[in-house]
Amino acid sequence: MAIEGEKKKDPRAWDALTPSLAEWVLDAISSMGFEKMTPVQASTIPLFMGNKDVVVEAVTGSGKTLSFLIPVVEKLLRLEEPLKKHHVGAIIVSPTRELATQIHSVLTSLLKFHEPSAEALQPLEEGEKRKPSSTLRVIPQLLLGGTTTPAQDLSRFLKNSPNLLISTPGRLLELLSSPHVHCPQSSFEVLVLDEADRLLDLGFKDDLQKILGRLPKQRRTGLFSASVSEAVGEIVRVGLRNPVKIAVKVKGAGGGDKMTPASLQMSYLLTPPTHKFPALLSLLSQLEPTPQKSIIYLSTCAAVDYFQPLLEAVLPKQFGLVSLHGKHPPNVRQRNFSKYVAAVSPTILLTTDVAARGLDIPQVDLVVQIDPPSDPKVFLHRCGRAGRAGRKGLSVIFLQPGREEDYIPFLEIRKTPITPLKRPEISTTGEAAKILISKMRKEVLSDRALYDKGQRAFVSWVQAYSKHQASSIFRVADLDWTDLGNAWALVRLPKMPELKKWEGDKTLGIKLDMSEYAYKDKIREKARRVAMEEAKNAGPYVPTEEQIAKKKQREAWSQKHEKQDLKELKREKKKRKREIERLEKMTDEEKKEEQAKEKELQDLIEQVKKRKIEDDADVEFEGFAD
């Protein structure tokens, strides 16, 4: 019986865990500012520490990283004796370099509070090797493809003898293939697969199976995933032993499941293309307090490269801007990402879907989607970069008035409701839009290199728009080309198939002598002028024999297909004629039976379609990766 007046311990208090955490872990968590466990931490940590395999499904910002790092560290520090040299005790597998780097960063922040491990984190001198120690400690090694070579990774492994590896699948597999790296049953304790669904989406299934094959079956395994799809289920069956499934849901206002944390507000703003960037600037300047970390999403890598210098020219001075996309070299991606994370003043990350999942960037206050993603599943993961770990966050998507408004009920069906943005109240005028476009266009006119980037970026954007999975909502045929061209601060619309039949002004009313439009780079400009002079003196164009032969080949191929199309048309006409003759010979009773069968078939098709839509709604959006 409880003593009267005795306070009941909060089940989400860190010191309420059983088995209890080490004092230094509690100190580390307190210094990180985490007063209480999140529901996923309270559910996962005791089970994972208590020798259970776990499959964890939870929304974004739910604290999954600490849910596996704390049990992994505790397991390694509760061994009876230190592991032998070059023996690995734990492995954490991540789908991307950025996420692996994040996990390693959180781990090192944790280990700074454990004195023996903190000492082991200090870099060794040239030629020095890690001395064996009788004290238990955690020595991590981060393995990333594209930043170091496999030989350098192995050399570092042999020098430091780490007992915990954090890696992307390919680089991990290369290291495990070395005869100098040992993961025997006597040493290996735990495997963590973070973002398991993302690992499989990126095609790492074969690598994962090979990794599992190199590890002892008697081990603890934790699988952390946004959704447990059939493919993830297969990994569960092969790699886990009687796992406990933990699914943490968030309830919406109507009592149904929501795919986002309660601290995240997801809104939309209806705005024509030319008003998108004025609306963005208005949002950044009106939000109170000023967002410290913001993420702006664009559709393509080329668009990020084009808009970065334009936004730098028009953004308020207090905001820094960093770009990140999948076509950046690995060292540039890593440098830019680190710069963004470490920024102490308000900073914006201009990016593509490379930053839509897995990145646990602290203090992201605002996410703005200038372009809706081609894949509706990604919408959730973009939003989920804000509002993490209970912190308030705002996500805003810009939609064009008209057909794009259908995206709102489309998301509602998928349990992802978005509401109109009411605070701050954003209103933009045509005059403000003209002034901003003029400033951006001034940048474009200052360097022909930006003109080239704009042409490529606009074409890539149109291609991305045309491939949207919600193709009935996002239709190229509905686009206002003049408004779009001005919104992009273009000085010419590019040549592309979509504009062949368009009769508008492709110069957008800009008078420009293209022959005098120069590159800032003197070498490029000199090369352009030389090429221009050569073309002027070259005389009339005469095709080569090879070009003539290719043209004939294309014409022959085209004629062949025309004949095939004609035959197909004749067959279709004959088929329709036979069907009409068959129906004419039928009695009224037979016709009624035929119509009944046709209706039954149509009903069946509709049922299947409806079931597929419902299944898609359940499967596509089952939460976020952390």
Swiss-Prot record:
Q: Its Gene Ontology molecular function terms?
A: ATP binding; ATP hydrolysis activity; RNA binding; RNA helicase activity
Q: Where is the composition biased (Basic and acidic residues)?
A: 554-571, 578-599
State the name under which the record lists this protein: ATP-dependent rRNA helicase spb4
What's one GO-annotated cellular component?
Answer: 90S preribosome
Q: Which gene encodes it?
A: spb4
State which Enzyme Commission number(s) the record gives.
3.6.4.13
Protein family per UniProt: Belongs to the DEAD box helicase family. DDX55/SPB4 subfamily.
Free-text comment on this protein's domains from its UniProt entry = The Q motif is unique to and characteristic of the DEAD box family of RNA helicases and controls ATP binding and hydrolysis.
What organism does this protein naturally occur in?
Answer: Botryotinia fuckeliana (strain B05.10)
**Major localisation:** nucleus
Output the GO biological process annotations, alphabetical, semicolon-separated: assembly of large subunit precursor of preribosome; maturation of LSU-rRNA
Classification via InterPro entries: CTT_SPB4, DEAD/DEAH_box_helicase_dom, Helicase_ATP-bd, Helicase_C-like, P-loop_NTPase, RNA-helicase_DEAD-box_CS, RNA_helicase_DEAD_Q_motif, SPB4-like_CTE
Task: Provide the assembly information.
Answer: Component of pre-60S ribosomal complexes.
> Where is this gene product found?
Nucleus, Nucleolus
Region feature Disordered, mapped onto this chain: 553-599
Q: Where would I look for the motif DEAD box in this sequence?
A: 194-197
**Motif Q motif in this chain:** 14-42
Give the UniProt keywords, A-Z: ATP-binding, Coiled coil, Helicase, Hydrolase, Nucleotide-binding, Nucleus, Ribosome biogenesis, RNA-binding, rRNA processing
Using the record for this protein, list the coiled-coil segments as residue ranges, or answer none: 558-620
Among its keywords, does the record have DNA-binding?
no
Species lineage? Eukaryota, Fungi, Dikarya, Ascomycota, Pezizomycotina
Q: Which residues form the Helicase C-terminal domain?
A: 279-437
**Keyword Hydrolase listed:** yes
Catalytic activity reads:
ATP + H2O = ADP + phosphate + H(+)
